[in-house]
């Protein structure tokens, strides 16, 4: 059996494009079980405030622990964590703390993500992402051995102003 687990961001739920289409692709690749996490967090002032971001991470991590507590991880032959924004830190921490042998897709990771040393990961980030210093995150990804696809002028949803480049 193959399991895909989606770790959303705070304002980016699992039915938004990056996570929605990624899990559809995972299903096409044979992932026959899916878990979609949901978070409740309503505080403002996270951007640019490491202490507030860490508090949010701690809250979301606790919620993820609760939602994933009944999973029998050894029954799965293959586990894929799809994560977005602060969810990338939650997924990295969860895999590390529980020794989950998984692959990870990290959409728009934060600096905090690489402090948690995600393993078997591939990351995607835009240079115009207001939540991340793209070049600092790129350096952290490199130091962690995580391949990073960096998209010029893409925002926190990996969108650009121009969809057509000629």
Please place each PLM-identified region on the residue numbering:
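Conserved small/polar residues in nucleotide/adenosyl-binding loops
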Residues: 164-166
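Acidic catalytic loop of the alpha/beta-hydrolase fold
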Residues: 128-132
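Serine-hydrolase catalytic machinery in alpha/beta-hydrolase-like enzymes
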Residues: 2-75
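Short beta-strand/loop motif that positions the catalytic acidic residue
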Residues: 123-125
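Catalytic histidine neighborhood in serine/cysteine hydrolases
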Residues: 33-35, 143-159
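Gly/Ala-rich beta-loop-alpha elbow adjacent to hydrolase catalytic centers
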Residues: 82-91
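A conserved short beta-strand
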Residues: 100-109
